[in-house]
């Protein structure tokens, strides 16, 4: 991977408000002089992977997780996908925000779209040997969330490797109207 030491990776779920919240967050990060790698529509686990994979200084998933549709927020991780908490930087961020003393950067950050899930799928499939699998029927239900496209890539790769798995797909198309 291309190292991105001065970058934040960001992705978002399928909620109707996620894309606009992600765009606003990206603009703020760029204005602060930090580069952004936009992963597109992702699950939180993809942001965690990309933060480490691209050697970014942090990651953000725009999501409200299991909360109702009218909620939204930001899940933050530090470098190497380490959790961020009051003890590990969140209190510092709060203090800076409350004081309003922001640094003016020498230049605006740079934006890059990297919505290719290949490295993530390679990582996941690196844990198994498709040829060693026994015949299996698997029902996969991503609940119309952001995992559907990633699961499509996984099933395609396993089928191309002649893995003896039959996939039954339910609720596969991303749909933010839950």
Where are these regions (language model features)?
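N-terminal small/polar loop signature for handling phosphorylated ligands or for N-terminal nucleophile
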Residues: 4-71, 153-178
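Gly/Ser/Thr-enriched, mixed-charge loops and adjacent short helices
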Residues: 72-178
């Amino acid at each position: 991977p291309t190292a991105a030491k001065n970058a934040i990776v960001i992705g978002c779920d399928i909620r109707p408000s996620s894309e606009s919240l992600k765009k606003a967050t990206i603009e703020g990060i760029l204005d602060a002089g930090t580069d952004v790698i936009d992963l597109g529509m992702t699950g939180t686990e993809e942001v965690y992977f990309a933060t480490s994979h691209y050697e970014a200084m942090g990651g953000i998933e725009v999501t409200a997780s299991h909360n109702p549709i009218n909620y939204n927020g930001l899940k933050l991780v530090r470098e190497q996908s380490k959790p961020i908490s009051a003890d590990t930087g969140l209190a510092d961020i709060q203090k800076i925000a409350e004081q309003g003393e922001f640094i003016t950067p020498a230049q605006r950050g740079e934006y890059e779209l990297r919505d290719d899930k290949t490295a993530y799928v390679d990582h996941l499939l690196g844990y198994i040997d498709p040829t060693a699998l026994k015949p299996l029927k698997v029902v996969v239900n991503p609940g119309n969330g952001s995992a559907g496209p990633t699961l499509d890539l996984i099933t395609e790769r396993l089928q191309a490797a002649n893995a003896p798995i039959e996939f039954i797909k339910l609720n596969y198309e991303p749909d933010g109207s839950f």
